[in-house]
Amino acid sequence: HISQDLVKYSEQSLFDLFHKHAPNATMIVALGNHDSAPSDVAAPSNLPDGLADQLSWDWDNVAALVKSEGWGDNVTSEKIRTHYGGYSISPRQGLRVISLNTDMWYRNNPFSYLNIDNPDPSHMLRWLTDELQAAEDNNERAWIVGHVLPGWDGGDSIDNPTNLLYHIVSRFSHTIAHSFFGHKHEDMFHVWYESQSGNSSSVSRKTQNARAMAFIGPSITPLHNVNPSLRVYHVDPETYEVMDYSQYYTQLYNFEKLNKTGPVWELLYKARDTYSNFSMSEKQGKYTAPVRLENGTWPKSAPLNASFWAALTDEMEVRPELIQLHQLYQGRNSPKSPACDTKECYEAKLCYMRSASSNLGRHCPSGFGSVQSF
């Protein structure tokens, strides 16, 4: 049973643990669908009869914890209370991190269906736009962080908010260095392309039109038959773009030993070493990213940006063994992950990777979005 006391206790314990082991780091908090009681619920501020305040205890708790741990000041705390647990912060000069409560577009949040024709009843996306405009005006780069992904197979979010987000990301793509989401417990990504909306009829998913991308990170929690995992990003300190990342995992078959030794984290793969060879698509005339390759390989000086990941989907089309490898890494080398070795699976995976809105994802072939066994 998930109660308010349990949520508060969990948040306090987790934040204290982070602060203990990384006392000089600024932790960025992004609330997910299990960070409320009941789960999956976030109420927008325009509800009548006090209904909008039923989750205010959660925002108040997070605001107090962020301040007490030294990760924000009074201004940060007020933003958290105002924006449903979301806030913006500048941990380094030239970088603005914007945390969103993505339960506002979560398909399982019952309040998402009130005023459903309005893409932003909570005004969260308006606030995001204001933050991105301020970042643009101040020549800052922005990271967007959240829990529920806006796209992939279309099963987690609703259409109107993620269509509006698509337009916002397209407008501010030069300001947004990267976006980071989770929720699925799996290793995935998706790309935004130039578009005024996330509707399938308006998006030309061509690599030369790639504008932004989102890392959908795997989880430490194994959930259903995937191995625990954690990721270390290697970031350019001036542009705040990701140059590489290292993915670590631990095998669950060692679980009985963990109470004596703790988990042993092994390197599973590095993104650049694994995915930066585009020689086959270049040879076949299908490489169209605006970056000149070096002997068929993505230059070491170039970031792993939207063009990189869009070009990777083109390379996967001509080298489907890369899709199979991505499928293996999606479950972090889990023996329980199903193979992706059919034309139907290949086409579905490529479609998901090119779908950064719910609408786009739902127009992809269904049934191949997850590697977990439920």
Q: What do these predicted ranges mean?
A:
Residues H1-D53:
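Core catalytic region of metal-dependent phosphoesterases/phosphodiesterases
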Residues L6-Q12, R81, S157-P161, N225:
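Short, glycine/acidic-rich beta->alpha junctions
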Residues S13-A30, P161-F180, H185, S197-T221:
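Histidine/cysteine- and/or acidic
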Residues L14-F15, V41-W59, G155-V169, S197-S201:
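Short, electropositive alpha-helical surface patch
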Residues T26-L31, D35-P38, S88-S90, R96-L100, ...:
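Structural recognition of the beta-strand scaffold that forms the well-ordered cores
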Residues V29-D40, Y106-N108, V148-G155, D159, ...:
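Active-site environment of divalent metal-dependent phosphoester hydrolases
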Residues G50-R96, N101-N109, Y113-A134, N138, ...:
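Metal-dependent phosphoesterase/phosphodiesterase active-site architecture
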